[in-house]
Each structure stands twice: as structure tokens, then as C-alpha cells.
Amino acid sequence: MEAKAVARTIRIAPRKVRLVLDLIRGKNAAEAIAILKLTNKASSPVIEKVLMSALANAEHNYDMNTDELVVKEAYANEGPTLKRFRPRAQGRASAINKRTSHITIVVSDGKEEAKEA
């Protein structure tokens, strides 16, 4: 059984978010939370919040035991880019791309759900 949580349009670049997601992928939920609390990156609190939401979804929607849950999938896709301009010398301007992320975390208890024929 799986439960999922998604945070959309987070104002942190996906490349930076993926650094932290790589640390928790495949880990036990409790271990992943401990790692996130000790990781000194701007995306850590946001990812922790998404993970807690996935655990709450698992417990509330599917009656799963949160002690047995494992982070099955954790990925960050690119969201909409905010385009800004920085003034430069001699009247020119440079483009600045402020990137956003869609963060998805899927937790699983390792048991397969019965498929209907």
C-alpha cells in the first residue's frame, strides 16, 4: 500500500532539492525525519513537511502503521520559472531565472494491495 504527498511551486531550485531527497530515498520514515532535522539545507524543512504529510495521509486515509513505512519514491520536478531581469552596464539587462519545484514523496509499507480482476 502506498500514500503520497505533493508540494507544488516551492521557491527552491529542483537541483538543490534533489540533493536532500537523495539522502532520504529508500530509508525508514523515522530515519528520514532524523536525517532531515540534521541536514543544513534550505529545502530540508519543506521536505520534512511533505514527508510528514505523506505519513499523515498513510495513517488517516489507508490505516497504515507509520512505524513500518519506508520512503519508496522521492523526486523533485521543475515548476514554473519566474523570469526577472538584472540591470547591467551600458543600459543592458541580464535574465535571471528564479526556479521553482514540485516535490513528491511516496511512502509504502512494502505490502502489495490486492488487485481486482
From Swiss-Prot:
Name of the featured protein: Large ribosomal subunit protein uL22
Keyword rRNA-binding (UniProt): yes
Gene: rplV
Protein species of origin: Staphylococcus aureus (strain NCTC 8325 / PS 47)
Function of the protein: This protein binds specifically to 23S rRNA; its binding is stimulated by other ribosomal proteins, e.g. L4, L17, and L20. It is important during the early stages of 50S assembly. It makes multiple contacts with different domains of the 23S rRNA in the assembled 50S subunit and ribosome.
Protein family (similarity comment): Belongs to the universal ribosomal protein uL22 family.
Cited NCBIfam families: rplV_bact
CDD domains membership: Ribosomal_L22 (cd00336)
Molecular functions (GO terms): rRNA binding; structural constituent of ribosome
